[in-house]
Amino acid sequence: MTLLIMITLTSISLLLAAAETIPTTLDGPFKPLTRRFEPSLRRGSDDLPMDHPRLRKRNVSSDFPEQIALALSTPTSMWVSWVTGDAIVGKDVKPLDPSSIASEVWYGKEKGNYMLKKKGNATVYSQLYPSDGLLNYTSGIIHHVLIDGLEPETRYYYRCGDSSVPAMSEEISFETLPLPSKDAYPHRIAFVGDLGLTSNTTTTIDHLMENDPSLVIIVGDLTYANQYRTIGGKGVPCFSCSFPDAPIRETYQPRWDAWGRFMEPLTSKVPTMVIEGNHEIEPQASGITFKSYSERFAVPASESGSNSNLYYSFDAGGVHFVMLGAYVDYNNTGLQYAWLKEDLSKVDRAVTPWLVATMHPPWYNSYSSHYQEFECMRQEMEELLYQYRVDIVFAGHVHAYERMNRIYNYTLDPCGPVYITIGDGGNIEKVDVDFADDPGKCHSSYDLFFFNSLNLSN
């Protein structure tokens, strides 16, 4: 069962699907509410098997695109990404040749009439482990094509692939967002995080798609490939735990491909923006981290002046989003801090009145799970968000929904952001139920699996 949360920013009110009235921040601080949950009823589900119909490879030929995804670049351009070829798992793996197949996107404003064509780049990556028993992995060919010249609030039809094979996808369509303006907003923005690939994940994503978002934001912890249980929820707690003497935990990389297939009905039609979580770190013996995440997702890093795709920003109508990286340097002498300060200083609130930040771990959290885990990041960056009057901060990591009063430095402040922890998107770890101290500080609802939906107007 999934709970849909609607946040209407005209009144900055939060309505739960349950028939209960929750105070708004419009009239200042409100008396905190907590709905208790019986821990014995805590629900979860096992990982979906790799041969599940929504996870397995469906194309007859590996030349045909799969795992198709859209991501915003600028207000008039969009990234189209997909995968071809077959990933390889084993002791000795040889990477595929990215130049062996083209990266093309045909697109236009009429069905079957593609007036515009663009070419892009392709890459592969490997996840390598030195220990006996652990499986190396090399990916399929990952394609990224930037399509531009897009008109706002317009439906486009597209196909992607290699026309010379020929191996082009079926026709798919998407609708562009409005240009940055105080008078124009995406009709609905969906926030979700901590997804994984369980039956609860399917419930969350199906419910999200039924609500027809025009933009999706995933606040980290996507595939849980590092915790995949090859025999479901039984036996060892993760794939590589069968090898206790290994110097490094392996992640089961085929779950990334399964996740891409699972998400394609959504990501191929709705631009989906991501930020990394702790489950995306995936360290290799060489010290490389975030390899899968970095190669698979196209994000507007360079477009927003960032030197890393682990943090970036973008506009969606009258909203400016900053996507913050919690697992890279965030101190006030570092590159991310300097980028954030520069980015926020350029925001014109007359054009984008709403300023929203996202990150994976919450700074404010009353649950025992991850309690004050990122206090150092808060101390480094919170003042900057407060100075530039960020309106809302969305986070995941803690598998329970929670919304704070406006706050700054642990003090109620009418100029501080509203902090929202999105809740559990359905992963294998289940929901969090224990508080760090006596409950009652803020509204909590944690017996269900979540995504959040944001409707905006000035």
UniProtKB/Swiss-Prot annotation:
<feature type="binding site">
    <location>
        <position position="360"/>
    </location>
    <ligand>
        <name>Mn(2+)</name>
    </ligand>
</feature>
<dbReference type="InterPro" id="IPR041792">
    <property type="entry name" value="MPP_PAP"/>
</dbReference>
<feature type="signal peptide">
    <location>
        <begin position="1"/>
        <end position="19"/>
    </location>
</feature>
<feature type="binding site">
    <location>
        <begin position="397"/>
        <end position="399"/>
    </location>
    <ligand>
        <name>substrate</name>
    </ligand>
</feature>
<keyword id="KW-0964">Secreted</keyword>
<feature type="glycosylation site" description="N-linked (GlcNAc...) asparagine">
    <location>
        <position position="121"/>
    </location>
</feature>
<feature type="binding site">
    <location>
        <position position="221"/>
    </location>
    <ligand>
        <name>Mn(2+)</name>
    </ligand>
</feature>
<comment type="subunit">
    <text>Homodimer.</text>
</comment>
<feature type="binding site">
    <location>
        <position position="221"/>
    </location>
    <ligand>
        <name>Fe cation</name>
    </ligand>
</feature>
<dbReference type="InterPro" id="IPR004843">
    <property type="entry name" value="Calcineurin-like_PHP_ApaH"/>
</dbReference>
<feature type="binding site">
    <location>
        <position position="278"/>
    </location>
    <ligand>
        <name>substrate</name>
    </ligand>
</feature>
<dbReference type="InterPro" id="IPR039331">
    <property type="entry name" value="PPA-like"/>
</dbReference>
<feature type="glycosylation site" description="N-linked (GlcNAc...) asparagine">
    <location>
        <position position="331"/>
    </location>
</feature>
<dbReference type="Pfam" id="PF00149">
    <property type="entry name" value="Metallophos"/>
</dbReference>
<feature type="binding site">
    <location>
        <position position="278"/>
    </location>
    <ligand>
        <name>Mn(2+)</name>
    </ligand>
</feature>
<comment type="similarity">
    <text>Belongs to the metallophosphoesterase superfamily. Purple acid phosphatase family.</text>
</comment>
<dbReference type="GO" id="GO:0005576">
    <property type="term" value="C:extracellular region"/>
</dbReference>
<dbReference type="InterPro" id="IPR015914">
    <property type="entry name" value="Purple_acid_Pase_N"/>
</dbReference>
<dbReference type="Pfam" id="PF16656">
    <property type="entry name" value="Pur_ac_phosph_N"/>
</dbReference>
<feature type="binding site">
    <location>
        <position position="224"/>
    </location>
    <ligand>
        <name>Fe cation</name>
    </ligand>
</feature>
<feature type="glycosylation site" description="N-linked (GlcNAc...) asparagine">
    <location>
        <position position="409"/>
    </location>
</feature>
<keyword id="KW-0325">Glycoprotein</keyword>
<keyword id="KW-0862">Zinc</keyword>
<feature type="glycosylation site" description="N-linked (GlcNAc...) asparagine">
    <location>
        <position position="455"/>
    </location>
</feature>
<protein>
    <recommendedName>
        <fullName>Purple acid phosphatase 23</fullName>
        <ecNumber>3.1.3.2</ecNumber>
    </recommendedName>
</protein>
<dbReference type="InterPro" id="IPR029052">
    <property type="entry name" value="Metallo-depent_PP-like"/>
</dbReference>
<feature type="glycosylation site" description="N-linked (GlcNAc...) asparagine">
    <location>
        <position position="59"/>
    </location>
</feature>
<dbReference type="InterPro" id="IPR008963">
    <property type="entry name" value="Purple_acid_Pase-like_N"/>
</dbReference>
<feature type="binding site">
    <location>
        <position position="397"/>
    </location>
    <ligand>
        <name>Mn(2+)</name>
    </ligand>
</feature>
<feature type="binding site">
    <location>
        <position position="399"/>
    </location>
    <ligand>
        <name>Fe cation</name>
    </ligand>
</feature>
<keyword id="KW-0378">Hydrolase</keyword>
<keyword id="KW-0479">Metal-binding</keyword>
<dbReference type="GO" id="GO:0046872">
    <property type="term" value="F:metal ion binding"/>
</dbReference>
<feature type="active site" description="Proton donor">
    <location>
        <position position="370"/>
    </location>
</feature>
<keyword id="KW-0732">Signal</keyword>
<feature type="binding site">
    <location>
        <position position="194"/>
    </location>
    <ligand>
        <name>Fe cation</name>
    </ligand>
</feature>
<dbReference type="GO" id="GO:0003993">
    <property type="term" value="F:acid phosphatase activity"/>
</dbReference>
<keyword id="KW-0408">Iron</keyword>
<feature type="glycosylation site" description="N-linked (GlcNAc...) asparagine">
    <location>
        <position position="136"/>
    </location>
</feature>
<feature type="glycosylation site" description="N-linked (GlcNAc...) asparagine">
    <location>
        <position position="200"/>
    </location>
</feature>
<comment type="function">
    <text>Acid phosphatase activity with ATP, ADP, dATP, pyrophosphate, polyphosphate, phosphoserine and phosphothreonine. Low or no activity with phosphotyrosine, AMP and phytate.</text>
</comment>
